[in-house]
Amino acid sequence: MALLMSAYPDLSVRDLRDLLARNATRIDAGQQPVQVSYTAANGQPRQVTGLEGWERNAAGLWYSPTYGFGLIDVNKTLTAAANHTPLPPLVQLPAQKVTVPRSEGSIADVGSSATRSSTQVAQALTVEAVQVTVSLDHQRLPDLLIELVSPSGTRSVLLNPNNSLVGQSLDRQQLGYVRTKGLRDMRMLSHKFYGEAAQGEWRLEVTDVSNSSRQLTLVDLNTNRRSTLTERNNSQPGQLLNWSLRVIGHDAARS
């Protein structure tokens, strides 16, 4: 970054990021997605992607949640910078909030399909990043897979299942009650849609992928003391309450 800035001091941070992303080299190209298999409540086996490997978005850019856009190629980026056209001014759309009707927001335990909610973006923008906030009720957050699907069909995992959001189970074990019902305006950001068209339908999907109890070992870093935490399955379905979408990008007509 410093080398690029010294060679081309007039380029903005957004332009530098654009150059780095478009000229990066894919490493560990054989990286495979992490698949999560479970038996749905209807008895049918189901498999979902809990963490993506390398995937190419609709703008033709490769992206991995592990490696981002890839390894920086300094020489290639410097060469491209010589003929780079600066990006149009940044546009940050207001957050579009979607309140989900109760009849549509139930998150089934080990569901045979995802709970879905959609919103439309009318503006013709080229995406640089997408910000999502989510509010939902659920008694065991590590069961949840949260994904965002773009108008072009690109799918980005925003929250991985088997995550470390174990505070509810810890409260239940240590306090006898739970202080939180789930997520409230949890903010998540995705760069996977970089370069895609923002206009069209964006869809949020939430899936509960587990109904089995789990045991975790917790380590106190101060005392090195170990304790066991039992995560019991949620006793009732979750509920998607609301979510919002905010697109950050630039005028597609000026790209």
Where are these regions (language model features)?
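Extended recognition patches within non-cytosolic domains
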Residues: 15, 19, 78-86
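Loop and turn regions of beta-sandwich accessory domains that flank beta-strands and are enriched
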Residues: 62, 81-255
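Active-site/binding-pocket entry motifs
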Residues: 26, 77-78
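Hydrolase catalytic cores
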Residues: 1-62
